[in-house]
Amino acid sequence: MKKEVCSLAFLKAVFAEFLATLIFVFFGLASALKWPSALPTILQIALAFGLAIGTLAQALGPVSGGHINPAITLALLVGNQISLLRAVFYVVAQLVGAIAGAGILYGLAPGNARGNLAVNSLNNNTTPGQAVVVEMILTFQLALCIFSSTDSRRTSPVGSPALSIGLSVTLGHLVGIYFTGCSMNPARSFGPAVVMNRFSPSHWVFWVGPIVGAAVAAILYFYLLFPNSLSLSERVAVVKGTYESEEDWEEQREERKKTMELTAH
């Protein structure tokens, strides 16, 4: 675990999550600013969030996995795909990035367009119970899309994972905005709420709904539909951050072999 945290690759990954969430929140919230000359449309906001997540998944996904969402990070932990320590660092980086992105937009947007900075709230007489279920469903489909399109075990063509994920986020917003403003991402809800100091009594909805929805998707995908053939000790090693796959061992063996050959010469 200590080895994982101290590695340069791990630090780069944590920074990538911070940066990606900052950019995602900035562009997403900016699309919802209420300019007096032209109010935003549902389609505009949905496309902005979808394009932002697709772009960032393509750009920074190779560095960190492109979670950009605490619900997805925690779901991958539930699915035994990442270590506990990585999950903690990622979630902290995402939340700080979301606050930074919302803060930058707050400083740049004029007061007459800023509004409430697109803080999530319950719309159209939606009850907290209804909102939780909606957020669960929206995030469930997003998480399934992410798990399937980025699964290295797939042998069938998957196309562009970034495009698929971006379209999934767009789909969620086209439906969810009418209910909750559409979160699907606790960081997206947390950032502007901190900057605007507007934590409504229903703020918990935007944590519980996405996290539960993504976790259910992880259980379904990684344990029922496409389970990993890992032993209990290997699963524990994944959580602890000490697991090394056969591919990792093979790469290390080849590196040692090359080093020995160079030393011999």
UniProtKB/Swiss-Prot annotation:
Residues 34-39, 109-126, 180, 192-203 are extracellular. GO terms for molecular function: identical protein binding; water channel activity. Coiled coil: none annotated. One of its GO terms (cellular component) is plasma membrane. It is a multi-pass membrane protein. Pfam families: MIP. It is found in: Apical cell membrane; Cell membrane; Cytoplasmic vesicle membrane. Aquaporins contain two tandem repeats each containing three membrane-spanning domains and a pore-forming loop with the signature motif Asn-Pro-Ala (NPA). Belongs to the MIP/aquaporin (TC 1.A.8) family. Homotetramer; each monomer provides an independent water pore. Interacts with TRPV4; the interaction is probably indirect and regulates TRPV4 activation by hypotonicity. This is Aquaporin-5. The gene is AQP5.
